[in-house]
A protein has these predicted regions:
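Macromolecular interaction modules
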Residues: 1-256
Length: 256
């Protein structure tokens, strides 16, 4: 069907989002704003600007999660980095961007998104990396996601070294179609795309390698999710809860 037409996009065209909930919002209010406004608006207001894939996950309210771990994560693929930056010439994109302040802590870039660089063995805090240097389609593929906290027995520098070693092993030994990671001083976020060719019912994964260097962690399997509405339809919104994870499905713009 047209909504799942495969399009390969470069791994450096993804924005890696780590969002922290506004303290004034309760968990129910946070999830409500994500489900009624933010997640659907990301899709409906960004398709015409060149959005290629959008995979959000909700961590707020998960048992054991510490405040230094993001409350929401997402990867947003674009046709290219240039396409993303050109989007700000559009009123719809500028309007959508303003909605962040009603949901997330934006001061001092606590909540932020960044483009990745190719992983070459070392990590820097808040600089995402991609492990597989070839294009892939993350909307039509099977995605796994893990978010984890730094062990309390480690300082941030040691944590960074341990995670870099784990990512190096994944890059060298695990046959994936894509892998993206970002480390903060207190957390790691990581996504991987399973091989597209049919084969084993248990595709290769790097998740256990990373889980061994994490303290608290949670694995997500984003569910393919369609939005059967337009911007001007009457609609109550999505059901977003703590632990929700979506691989949003949509028809890309025609010239993508």
């Amino acid at each position: 069907m047209s909504e799942r037409k495969s399009t390969l996009v470069r791994p450096d065209s993804v924005r890696v989002w780590r969002g922290f909930r506004l303290p004034a919002l309760t968990l129910d209010q946070f999830c409500s704003k994500l489900g009624t406004v933010f997640v659907p608006a990301t899709v409906k207001m960004q398709i015409a600007a060149g959005l290629e894939a959008y995979i959000p996950s909700i961590l707020a309210g998960l048992p054991g999660k510490v405040d230094s771990v993001p409350d929401e994560t997402a990867i947003l693929f674009w046709e290219s980095q240039e396409t993303y930056w050109n989007g700000f010439t559009r009123l719809a994109v500028r309007t959508y961007t303003l909605t962040h302040g009603g949901v997330y802590v934006t001061e001092n870039q606590k909540s932020r998104a960044d483009f990745p660089v190719l992983f070459a063995g070392a990590l820097s805090f808040d600089q995402p990396v991609y492990l597989i240097d070839r294009p892939a389609d993350w909307m039509c593929g099977v995605v796994s996601h893990v978010v984890g906290a730094r062990p309390t027995s480690q300082d941030p520098a040691t944590f960074c070294t341990e995670v870099a070693g784990a990512l190096g092993r994944i890059q060298k030994k695990v046959a994936l179609d894509g892998a993206i990671a970002c480390i903060g001083s207190d957390y790691l976020v990581y996504w991987e795309l399973a091989p597209s060719a049919p084969g084993s019912p248990h595709p290769p994964t790097g998740l256990p390698i990373l889980q061994r260097v994490l303290d608290w962690n949670r694995v997500f399997m984003p569910a393919p999710t369609f939005l059967p509405i337009g911007l001007w339809d009457e609609w109550a919104g999505m059901d977003v809860q703590s632990g929700s994870s979506f691989n949003m499905q949509f028809k890309r713009r025609e010239n993508s």
